[in-house]
Amino acid sequence: SLMQFKTLIMKIAGRSGIWYYGSYGCYCGGGGQGRPQDASDRCCFVHDCCYGKVTGCNPKMDVYTYTEENGAIVCGGDDPCKKQICECDKDAAICFRDNIDTYDNKYWFFPAKNCQEESEPC
């Protein structure tokens, strides 16, 4: 679920998902179009693509199971669809963490009119 995604971003990247990524670049937040503006925006693009491949459940609403083992998030549970959602969220949170150094405030509330380039395929 999106609430769990927010929690994983805090656990893994150490920052607020809503504050930092709720409206960033062309892909972080609702919707997405054009080309990702930087590495953090690309994390959101890849996350959107990941959600797009999930079938049989609702990535934004369905609650999944995970545990923390030696500081790492381990996705679990019996439902392969929900496990896939968890993996999408975990990978995006790791991507955010790994790209904190290049995060740029100029992409906060980035105008959609600047996201008109042709999108690349997932």
Swiss-Prot record:
Expressed by the venom gland. It is found in: Secreted. Coiled coil: none annotated. Ca(2+) binds at residues 27, 29, 31, 48. Pfam families: Phospholip_A2_1 (PF00068). PROSITE patterns: PA2_ASP (PS00119), PA2_HIS (PS00118). InterPro entries: PLipase_A2 (IPR001211), PLipase_A2_Asp_AS (IPR033112), PLipase_A2_dom (IPR016090), PLipase_A2_dom_sf (IPR036444), PLipase_A2_His_AS (IPR033113). Belongs to the phospholipase A2 family. Group II subfamily. D49 sub-subfamily. PLA2 catalyzes the calcium-dependent hydrolysis of the 2-acyl groups in 3-sn-phosphoglycerides. This is Acidic phospholipase A2 A'.
